[in-house]
Amino acid sequence: MEITKSLESGKLTLTVSGEIDTLTAPRLDGEVETEGLSELVFDLTDVTYVSSAGLRVLLLAHKKMVQAGGKMTITHPQEAVRRVFTLTGFVKILTIV
C-alpha cells in the first residue's frame, strides 16, 4: 500500500493505492490526522481491496471528523471496493462519490 498526503486550506487528502488489509490498515490509521481539519478525503482510485481492518480505519476517521465538526469523503472507489461498502452498509454511513 502506498499513501500520498496533500494538505490545503484545512483539507487533507490521502491518496491510497494497493490493498487496505490487516497488515496495511495500521499504517493508514497512523496517517489519519483530524485535528484542525475541516475536511478529510480518501482518494481510493487505485485501491483494489479493503478488508474489515480497513473499514474500521475509515469508520474511526469518519467518527473523528464528525466529532470535530468536519466532514469526510471517500472518492473514486473501484467497483470491487464500492461493492464492499454496499454489502457492509457503509454507503449509508459514509459519503462516497
What kind of region is each of these model predictions?
Residues 2-28, 48-49:
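STAS-typified acidic loop motif
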Residues 22-93:
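Amphipathic alpha-helical interaction surfaces in cytosolic regulatory modules
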Residues 95-97:
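Short acidic-hydrophobic, aromatic-tinged amphipathic segments that line or gate anion-handling sites
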